[in-house]
């Protein structure tokens, strides 16, 4: 059994590639059902910075290829698109990666806590799809707990802790616009809500929300005391705005170049566009329009680098905490790796004992019921004594995979027996 994770990240994969691999929330249930055809357990984490598929598989190399094939088939892309930047982790490396991720150590914005909500959401969707089993349940809940501990005991989560807060920091280059300008938030999800909070905290009060689902726009607007307009008013709302934050889950372009050209015509002040969606909401051609300044997720990287440098010492402290939590998980994992073999070993011994007892009792029909019970009890005791030391050795967290392989070979236990035992309740 192996834990495998494949993925691409903002650090080494441009948004032009990430947006072709991304899954929106509505696609995830069906995608997870498809993933279960390849693996025993699985989860998909798709955010503006990363697309990752994590799974528990029975065969290491075959599992890697299955996950790559899954991405190719689900996204309709050639593997050559993502192969150069794809990372592949196994077992302990997966656990370390997910624990660091939940602590914000692997984020574009070091220490950001938005990833916690994204992991919880991905976990809930995977649970609902029946894709989460005992291993990923333990890994992901352990990651969330480790991330919380790292944030609680270090200063990694101080200051700018989300892509949204970094975007607001970029807006401060235009203080008059932020204080006196009109802002438009396109979308009504988690990132849209974060955007509202940060815009209001930054001094911007003239804010309008536009969203395809009017009920969600209305609810969000009432919660924060801002205005909202229906989706049909999007272009008019754009023309009336100075700052635009677009963060929908739309599969394609929301603001076309032509729409932005019309909105920018005759303006005397800059039009700031922040595209925080993946796939991107805003046509990249708008960057060529005079007076229009487009920032997508990747364009915010320079500010994030400064953020990481300032928090380097706190990040080291957080890494130490994460390593301790990873070690705890790996002790549990080592034992779990041995459990199917132990069950199969005991079943093998019991099958042999049962066959020999039946043969022996058939030869001794004169034995009384009490004597028969004594013989059966004796055989059980012998089996338990013989298996005790091997089982203790297999349960040792320090036991290697070579020991498991050796035991299977010595007792002629095939993989089918091992995985049948693994699925026993």
UniProtKB/Swiss-Prot annotation:
<dbReference type="InterPro" id="IPR006151">
    <property type="entry name" value="Shikm_DH/Glu-tRNA_Rdtase"/>
</dbReference>
<dbReference type="InterPro" id="IPR015895">
    <property type="entry name" value="4pyrrol_synth_GluRdtase_N"/>
</dbReference>
<dbReference type="Pfam" id="PF01488">
    <property type="entry name" value="Shikimate_DH"/>
</dbReference>
<comment type="subunit">
    <text>Homodimer.</text>
</comment>
<dbReference type="InterPro" id="IPR036291">
    <property type="entry name" value="NAD(P)-bd_dom_sf"/>
</dbReference>
<comment type="similarity">
    <text>Belongs to the glutamyl-tRNA reductase family.</text>
</comment>
<feature type="binding site">
    <location>
        <begin position="112"/>
        <end position="114"/>
    </location>
    <ligand>
        <name>substrate</name>
    </ligand>
</feature>
<comment type="pathway">
    <text>Porphyrin-containing compound metabolism; protoporphyrin-IX biosynthesis; 5-aminolevulinate from L-glutamyl-tRNA(Glu): step 1/2.</text>
</comment>
<feature type="binding site">
    <location>
        <begin position="47"/>
        <end position="50"/>
    </location>
    <ligand>
        <name>substrate</name>
    </ligand>
</feature>
<dbReference type="InterPro" id="IPR018214">
    <property type="entry name" value="GluRdtase_CS"/>
</dbReference>
<dbReference type="GO" id="GO:0019353">
    <property type="term" value="P:protoporphyrinogen IX biosynthetic process from glutamate"/>
</dbReference>
<keyword id="KW-0627">Porphyrin biosynthesis</keyword>
<dbReference type="InterPro" id="IPR036453">
    <property type="entry name" value="GluRdtase_dimer_dom_sf"/>
</dbReference>
<dbReference type="GO" id="GO:0050661">
    <property type="term" value="F:NADP binding"/>
</dbReference>
<dbReference type="InterPro" id="IPR015896">
    <property type="entry name" value="4pyrrol_synth_GluRdtase_dimer"/>
</dbReference>
<keyword id="KW-0521">NADP</keyword>
<dbReference type="Pfam" id="PF05201">
    <property type="entry name" value="GlutR_N"/>
</dbReference>
<dbReference type="Pfam" id="PF00745">
    <property type="entry name" value="GlutR_dimer"/>
</dbReference>
<feature type="binding site">
    <location>
        <begin position="187"/>
        <end position="192"/>
    </location>
    <ligand>
        <name>NADP(+)</name>
    </ligand>
</feature>
<dbReference type="InterPro" id="IPR000343">
    <property type="entry name" value="4pyrrol_synth_GluRdtase"/>
</dbReference>
<keyword id="KW-0560">Oxidoreductase</keyword>
<comment type="function">
    <text>Catalyzes the NADPH-dependent reduction of glutamyl-tRNA(Glu) to glutamate 1-semialdehyde (GSA).</text>
</comment>
<feature type="binding site">
    <location>
        <position position="107"/>
    </location>
    <ligand>
        <name>substrate</name>
    </ligand>
</feature>
<dbReference type="GO" id="GO:0015995">
    <property type="term" value="P:chlorophyll biosynthetic process"/>
</dbReference>
<feature type="site" description="Important for activity">
    <location>
        <position position="97"/>
    </location>
</feature>
<protein>
    <recommendedName>
        <fullName>Glutamyl-tRNA reductase</fullName>
        <ecNumber>1.2.1.70</ecNumber>
    </recommendedName>
</protein>
<feature type="binding site">
    <location>
        <position position="118"/>
    </location>
    <ligand>
        <name>substrate</name>
    </ligand>
</feature>
<comment type="pathway">
    <text>Porphyrin-containing compound metabolism; chlorophyll biosynthesis.</text>
</comment>
<feature type="active site" description="Nucleophile">
    <location>
        <position position="48"/>
    </location>
</feature>
<keyword id="KW-0149">Chlorophyll biosynthesis</keyword>
<dbReference type="InterPro" id="IPR036343">
    <property type="entry name" value="GluRdtase_N_sf"/>
</dbReference>
<dbReference type="GO" id="GO:0008883">
    <property type="term" value="F:glutamyl-tRNA reductase activity"/>
</dbReference>
């Amino acid at each position: 059994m192996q834990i495998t994770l494949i993925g691409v990240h903002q650090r080494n994969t441009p948004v032009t590639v990430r947006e072709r691999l991304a899954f929106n929330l509505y696609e995830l249930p069906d995608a997870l059902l498809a993933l279960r055809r390849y693996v025993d357990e699985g989860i998909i984490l798709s955010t503006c910075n990363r697309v990752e598929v994590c799974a528990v598989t029975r065969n290491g190399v075959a599992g890697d290829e299955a996950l790559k094939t899954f991405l190719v088939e689900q996204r309709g892309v050639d593997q050559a698109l993502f192969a150069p930047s794809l990372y592949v982790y196994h077992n302990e490396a997966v656990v370390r990666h997910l624990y660091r991720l939940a602590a914000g150590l692997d984020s574009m914005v070091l220490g950001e806590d938005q990833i916690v909500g994204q992991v919880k959401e991905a976990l809930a969707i995977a649970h609902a799809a029946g894709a989460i089993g005992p291993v990923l349940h333990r890994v992901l809940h352990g990651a969330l707990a480790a991330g919380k501990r790292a944030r609680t005991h270090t200063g990694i989560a101080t200051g700018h802790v989300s892509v949204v807060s970094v975007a607001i920091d970029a807006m401060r280059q235009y203080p008059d616009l932020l204080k006196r300008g009109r802002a438009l938030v396109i979308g009504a999800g988690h990132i849209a809500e974060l955007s509202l909070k940060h815009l209001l905290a930054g001094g911007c009060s003239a804010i309008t929300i536009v969203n395809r689902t009017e009920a969600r726009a209305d609810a969000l607007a009432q919660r924060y005391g801002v205005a909202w307009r229906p989706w049909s008013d999007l272009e008019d709302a754009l023309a009336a705005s100075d700052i635009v934050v677009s963060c929908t889950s739309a599969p394609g372009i929301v603001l076309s170049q032509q729409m932005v050209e019309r909105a920018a015509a005759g303006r005397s002040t800059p039009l700031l566009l922040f595209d925080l969606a993946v796939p991107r909401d805003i046509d990249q051609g708008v960057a060529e329009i005079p007076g229009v300044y487009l920032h997508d997720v990747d364009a915010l990287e320079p500010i994030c680098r400064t953020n990481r440098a300032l928090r380097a010492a706190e990040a080291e402290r957080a890494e130490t905490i994460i390593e301790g939590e990873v070690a705890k998980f790996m002790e549990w994992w080592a034992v779990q790796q041995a459990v199917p073999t132990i069950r199969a070993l005991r079943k093998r011994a019991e099958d042999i004992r049962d066959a020999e007892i039946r043969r022996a009792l058939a030869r001794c029909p004169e034995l009384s019921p009490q004597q028969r019970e004594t013989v059966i009890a004796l055989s059980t005791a012998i089996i338990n004594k013989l298996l005790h030391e091997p089982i203790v050795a297999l349960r040792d967290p320090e036991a290697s995979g070579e020991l498991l392989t050796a035991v299977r070979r010595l007792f002629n236990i095939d993989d089918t027996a091992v995985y049948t035992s693994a699925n026993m309740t």
